[in-house]
Design a protein with these regions (language model features):
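Non-ligating segments of multi-cofactor redox enzymes
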Residues: 1-116
């Protein structure tokens, strides 16, 4: 089974994955194959209160419209979201292989669309 692994420690919130996916699937306004979710802002950890440093976290979440770009991956290409990720924090492959990349040092999310 294949999936997409996202190291959201490094996601910059650029929305490139959303745009590439939306264009490929031809989805109307308000529908997504991958949706960027923002959490924050909150004060930066370890800073004195009121110093003005804030942190955001961005997490791309695959939706039920995602088919892992089956037509592309069958030809050996990457899913559009992975190919267009500007931060290079998205990976496509076998779930077992992707799970081995998760080192416990950063924040990871492993998505397996269609898995039950």
């Amino acid at each position: 089974m294949n999936g997409i692994l996202i190291n959201y420690e490094y996601c910059t919130g650029c929305h490139s994955c959303e745009v590439a996916c939306k264009k490929r699937l031809g989805l109307p306004e308000g529908e997504f194959g991958i949706k960027l979710t923002e959490t924050g802002p909150w004060e930066y950890a370890g800073e004195p209160k009121g110093e003005g440093r804030w942190e955001w976290t961005w997490l791309p979440v695959l939706t039920k419209a995602c088919d892992l770009c089956a037509d592309r991956t069958e030809k050996g290409k990457m899913p559009m979201c992975v190919q267009h990720c500007q931060a290079w924090c998205m990976y496509y492959g076998e779930v077992e292989e992707l799970a081995r990349k998760m080192d416990g040092k950063t924040r990871w999310a492993l998505f397996t669309p269609g898995a039950k």
